[in-house]
Amino acid sequence: MADTKEMKKVLFGPILDNNPIALQILGVCSALAVTTKLETALVMSLALTAVTAFSNLFISMIRSQIPSSVRIIVQMTIIASLVIVVDQILKAYSYEISKQLSVFVGLIITNCIVMGRAEAFAMKSPPFISFLDGIGNGLGYSFVLIVIGTIKELFGFGTILGFEILPLIQNGGWYQGNGLLILPFSSFFLIGGLIWFIRTIKPEQVEPKE
């Protein structure tokens, strides 16, 4: 059983110290696509966190029984099964958001974060700590999506979760929405800015000069 210090490191380390998007540059594609509004960013964050945590748990539980030659196939089968469950739950209880997320929930199957944690951590670690690792990396992914989604919705649409914060000119207010932020590629610049900010407050993450 892992000690409390190790569990805290596994659970909270991926948020800033070892963020899967900002430091490892994994899972960037979905981060670009689903952050136009905070609501879709939150749902995608929850979906990926659940899949990563439970895939880590199940893979770790059977890791000693998986032949090395087929381990990737087994991992993808478990991950795909969990993604199907999550996708069906979204369609049942939040159909409109499911339509907005489109194929990106299904593409969690190929997300580098999920596959990477299964191979690098769950295959070598006990179930409970693997479960925490999945949650931790999900939180790190969620942190980036929530920050980007909040900025884009607030300054692009003047709202947060659909509630008006900055009254738009077309509605009789004073704020002119930034149309550039509504476009998916603007997430590149925002993620770049977030990476710069994190490496400013944590200079140990800056790559040494060659």
From Swiss-Prot:
GO MF annotation, one: oxidoreductase activity, acting on NAD(P)H, quinone or similar compound as acceptor
Gene Ontology CC entries for this record: plasma membrane
Reactions catalysed: a ubiquinone + n Na(+)(in) + NADH + H(+) = a ubiquinol + n Na(+)(out) + NAD(+)
Any Gene Ontology biological process: sodium ion transport
UniProt keyword terms in alphabetical order: Cell inner membrane, Cell membrane, Ion transport, Membrane, NAD, Sodium, Sodium transport, Translocase, Transmembrane, Transmembrane helix, Transport, Ubiquinone
Chain ranges passing through the membrane: 10-30, 42-62, 72-92, 103-123, 143-163, 178-198
EC numbers: 7.2.1.1
Location(s), subcellular: Cell inner membrane
Predominant cellular place of this UniProt entry's protein: membrane
EC primary class: translocase
Topology versus the membrane: Multi-pass membrane protein
Domain of life from the UniProt record: Bacteria
Database matches in InterPro entries: NqrD (IPR011292), NqrDE/RnfAE (IPR003667)
Protein family membership: Belongs to the NqrDE/RnfAE family.
Self-association and partners: Composed of six subunits; NqrA, NqrB, NqrC, NqrD, NqrE and NqrF.
Task of the protein: NQR complex catalyzes the reduction of ubiquinone-1 to ubiquinol by two successive reactions, coupled with the transport of Na(+) ions from the cytoplasm to the periplasm. NqrA to NqrE are probably involved in the second step, the conversion of ubisemiquinone to ubiquinol.
HAMAP family: NqrD (MF_00428)
Protein name: Na(+)-translocating NADH-quinone reductase subunit D
